[in-house]
Each structure stands twice: as C-alpha cells, then as structure tokens.
Amino acid sequence: MEAALKLARQYYLESGQPQRTRFISRHQSYHGITLGALAVGGHAARRAHFEPLLMPNVSRVSPCFAYRGKNAADETDEAYVRRLAQELDDEFQKVGPNTVCAFVAETVVGAVRLLPLSPSVRSTQMI
C-alpha cells in the first residue's frame, strides 16, 4: 500500500498537479499496518494509537457491504451500488475533485474471511 500511495503521488507531481494530495477510502477498510496503510484504512481501532503519526488528508465513505449496508430489504443491488457511487461522487465534490490523488478500494474484503464483491458491485461505477 505504501508504494501505491507514493506512486499515485509521484504520478500527479510528474503531471504538474501537485495539489492532488487527498485520498478517499472506505470506513472499516483494511489495507495493512504500515503508517500509510493505516492512514487510508477505515478501521478506527487499528488507527487509534497511531493517529498522531498518520496523514490527515484522508476522508472516508461507507463500506461496500450489501448485507449490512442496504437501507431497506427491498433496496436492489443496483440501487445500492448507485447510492454508494453517489456518495463517492459527493465526497469527491466536497473535498475538491482536483485535490484527490486516489480512491483506495478493496476488491476483496476481509482479512480473515474473504468476502468477494457481488457481480453488481464489481461495476465500473465503483472500481
């Protein structure tokens, strides 16, 4: 993860866009235990002891977990994906789309028990 963060930053430096310093990730996400990975990770308890050392330019959106994340029993997978995509777009607009360096997403969730994304979530809307 550390290398990916640095690669994204370097890309924008080389492209003449040094203002792109923000990262967006998901609440409850796990990307590793290095300082960079903890910074973009969404697990608050894992970050707590290291918070003073972590970069502050990370914001988070809802986790992509339909089992717990759907608003109602009748919300379709497609509607759920649209809602999450809208939330992500809203976050880009909030922080300024020209300041975002990367959206850090998990394509497979769960460090212990793998939770693959449903086919409707693996759309270009979210990844």
Whereabouts are the PLM-identified features?
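Active-site core of PLP-dependent enzymes with the aminotransferase class I/II
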Residues: 80-87, 91, 108-127
